[in-house]
Amino acid sequence: MFKTKKGNLKSLDYKKQDYVIKLSNTDSNNLESVLDSKIGLNNQTRQNNISKFGSNQIVVKKFLIFKKILETLIEPFNLLLLFIGILELIIYFLFQRNWITLISAFIIFFMIFLASIVDFIQEYKAYKFNLKLTKIIENDVFIFNDQIKDFNNLNYQNIKNNLIKEKQSNLTIGDVVYLSKGDIIPSDCRIIWSEDLYLDESTLTGESKAIKKQTTNNKTNFLELENILFKETLIVSGNCLAVVININKDNYSNSLLDLIDDEIITDYEKGINKVTKILIYLISILVFIITFISLLKTGISNWTSSLVFGLSIAVSLTPEALPAIISSNLKLASKRLSKNKVVIKKLSVLQNIGSVNILATDKTGTLTLDTTNIETYLDINNQKNKLLKQYFFYNAYFQNNLFDTIDKAIIDQFKTNISDIKLIDHLSFDHNFRISSVLINFNNSNLLITKGSLEEILEITSFINVNNQVINLCDNYKNMIIDQVNSYAKKGYKVLVLSYKNSDVIDNKNLIYLGMVVFSDQIRENVKQVIDTFKAYDIDIKVLSGDNLYTCKNVCDQVGINSNTSLIGKQINNLTKEELIKISQSVNIFYKLSPLDKAKIIDSLKSNNVVGFLGDGVNDAVALKKADVGISVNNASSLAKQSADVILLEKDLNALEHAFIIGRKTFSNAIKYIKITVASNFGILLTLLLATILFKFEVMSPIQLLIQNLIFDFANLIFVFDNVDESSIKKPQKWNIKSIIPFAIFNGLTQVIISFTNFMILYFGFNIKGLDTYSIELFQTCYFIECILTHIMIILVLRTDKLSFFKSIASKQMLISMLFFSVVCFMIVFISSSFNSLGFKMMIGNFNNINLSWWFLILLGLEILAWIISEIIKKIYLNIFKNWI
């Protein structure tokens, strides 16, 4: 989680260090006096402590206003504009006192301000919005809802009935929290009871080695204190009870926030950066050529005018609004998703969501409901055995697992008296070994009870209880057990079996088989329709499960997932990386998987695919991190939530369906803006290059180029509100930088053709040849208007691969905005022409005995022609490249 700028956290001056060390070295019975609080709080004392100490409010990295402003100002495009603006000021003050040059410089600075302020506002809004989302998805923690009075007899069984769930932010000094494997420490704590406790403290120390923790301390180094749990570290095994000793900003990890550099550049952001560099290089080279040609034609004595003209072209072609538009696009999508109960932890992951073409998911709780029901329990004779029921209950009851739905179902439905039972030891369920054991004192003898999946239990079982007689487990009985279990598994039931023996230790060998319990999962409502929708959007579903093949196949058949191909977890290690990549593409069911198996499968699926993985358990954390889009749910383990990119507030595939669609729409609008902007700018740049060669005058003045760019900037902001064709989101889209150049070359030709058609009409039809100032200004005004309207027409045509206006229409917001900016274009010309400023002249009256008003009718024809040419080029481009946006 933490990537520091300085690197060495141990040197940090932490104001509460001595206090924490003192608590570490204080005996548990004396903690109350040091903490100035009861150890363990009920509702009343908790409220009193919150009033006294405060609560563990979420602390996030500060939004540093001046730093963010500086970051927006030094965006590459803004730096380019800043350089040009300063250069124009130098020209004005030292070489050419032309007020147009001064105004031009101020317009450039205004453009920088505009782009920066929009980007800054979007960043700030995103920050505030993320604060709200952070509170929504904060972790719950189990707390002991009473005072701890006897520190010598603490254990899970004594306290579990008093555990309640509480939001992490509601913790206060003195709260006692129960933590187990996969939990992320919610606040700095002092351990008061532990069992085989190991932590991963790499978030603080950078060392991934598991660190043993216990109730006593023998270390002096602050970060090595053996009974202190630091916020944001992770429990990798065991469990504990710990008292909260720091909250809010006093937590050690929160004091590090200013040292943290948590910015990870995604492929999407790398792509944007690459496009930015390409555009800057392209603009710089071509502007240099245009300036050089202009200089050759006007002479060295007029170098300042040529330079200002070249600089103005550079400004007009610089898409300085790109960061703001991308940011707005992502933020709008994030808001839409939050309304659909989907929380995006990092905005840039939206691009990956739109590109997902494989969704890997667990079966339990996703395709089926989280609740589990017991259908029956049977011994080898297909009889409901009372002893079997009791032993299953003992095994489940004495497990230190608050989240296991299997154990919960057993405890709820197999209630048995445990007053004479004493727990000696236990072995929690492990996804690699797939068994759980308890060692209890029962009827004055020690009894080992182990439950698990069929294959794993049979490997450690040598005997069988038949009619209360223990005999050898021969092949005949073994086959009977397998047939009995499979008869239920084939019907879609989950089956666990149980073996036992008298033992003083947990050694799990030579056990006695007793029987099985059968569980049923209910298919989620409407899940089949959602799966069908995923298929329609070209998303392949892969089931990654720890269950057996029969159970997985039954569920998949019910929800419409192809179950013809499957792969068992133990085969994965026998395959080479290349073999696994090849096989995983065609397999839909992966069963009996360990956490490492899941991660390997996700890794193999990522070859030529964008993979989403939906998981909620501790065992899913590695796979969630491996996936291109890790998806978890709000009630998942804290480790799963931390590892995920996307959090579903409800475990509902419908919400995920909305996420994929909105992700694709967001991606489509972003790429649409980039491609259309590059195409239009390329067309304008090529037009100006050719015009500089062919004409003796500038076809558009520097100030007009800047005004045009301002209009383009405002117009482009509307892209985020555009509709997206259903056909363009039917298939996952990938970020392909290489496609931008051919798209720009082909579709930029429309701008060139229309502009030069306009030039020829003005030059030969209206006899406007730039022989005097008035003639030049008429020519420039006509090009200014035509260029803006053609740009708007190109936007409306290129936004879709369909026949624009007939088979695909832009959103109302976009159409109204484009109409508005068209009107603004004419208003600027009319107003400035009336005041004889900015070099605009209205096409009214006569010029060389020709009625200039006819040009407006020609302009209409030019825009219709622009639409026709754009559609023809679109058709040609699609035939060649087969893909549009």
Identify the meaning behind each predicted range.
Residues I228-L234, N352-Y513, F519, D532, ...:
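Cytosolic catalytic regions of ATP/NTP-dependent phosphoryl-transfer enzymes
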Residues S104-D140, N145, I264-I358, V517, ...:
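Hydrophobic alpha-helical transmembrane segments
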Residues G40-E71, K135-I143, Q147-I159, K209-K212, ...:
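Non-transmembrane, extramembrane segments of multi-pass ion/lipid transporters
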Residues L82-I107, Y281-T318, K331-K341, I684-I703, ...:
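Helix-interface capping motifs at the ends of transmembrane segments in multi-pass membrane proteins
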Residues Y198, T216, L369-K389, Q558-G560, ...:
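Basic, amphipathic juxtamembrane/active-site segments
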Residues M1-T172, V177-Y178, D183-I185, R190-Y198, ...:
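Non-lumenal N-terminal regulatory segments of integral membrane proteins
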